[in-house]
């Protein structure tokens, strides 16, 4: 099983995929986030946050006031399953999930919590 994937983010406020598929055979799963744009992180920064789909917008809303130094995530937010830091052009960061903590019956998703980005930068996370 391929237990990792790389997702690129751009200056056009987009990820290069709308879906992450995780093989149930994986013990852990790693997502590397890259940024192929040219803008710095304070202008067009992106992170990748994984949570239950129902929690995505509330996490992003609560994270607005946290600021860029806290990656636009509320400190100690237990709804966040995993997240990268906010990166800018040419940077990369990764996250690793314990696959055993995911429930096949639950709907998961990924998104960018940078202010205003979730509307365009989100997708599904599926166990298969």
Swiss-Prot record:
A GO term for molecular function: copper ion binding
Subcellular location: Periplasm
InterPro entries xrefs: Azurin, BlueCu_1, BlueCu_1_BS, Cu-binding_ET, Cupredoxin
Domain Plastocyanin-like stretches: 1-128
Cellular component terms per the entry's GO annotation: periplasmic space
Binding site for Cu cation: 46, 112, 117, 121
Classification via Pfam families: Copper-bind
Functional summary from the UniProt entry: Transfers electrons from cytochrome c551 to cytochrome oxidase.
Alphabetical list of PANTHER family matching this protein: AURACYANIN-B (PTHR38439), OUTER MEMBRANE PROTEIN H.8 (PTHR38439:SF2)
This protein's name: Azurin
Species this chain originates from: Pseudomonas fluorescens biotype B
């Amino acid at each position: 099983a391929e237990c990792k994937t790389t997702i690129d983010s751009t200056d056009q406020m987009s990820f290069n995929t709308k879906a992450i598929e995780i093989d149930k055979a994986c013990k852990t799963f790693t997502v590397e986030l890259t940024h192929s744009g040219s803008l710095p992180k304070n202008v067009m920064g992106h992170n990748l946050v994984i949570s239950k789909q129902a929690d995505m917008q509330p996490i992003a809303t609560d994270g607005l006031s946290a600021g860029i130094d806290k990656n636009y995530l509320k400190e100690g937010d237990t709804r966040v399953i995993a997240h990268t830091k906010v990166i800018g052009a040419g940077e990369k960061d990764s996250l690793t999930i314990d696959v055993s903590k995911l429930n096949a019956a639950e709907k998961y998703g990924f998104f960018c919590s940078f202010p205003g980005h979730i509307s365009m930068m989100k997708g599904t996370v599926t166990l298969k």
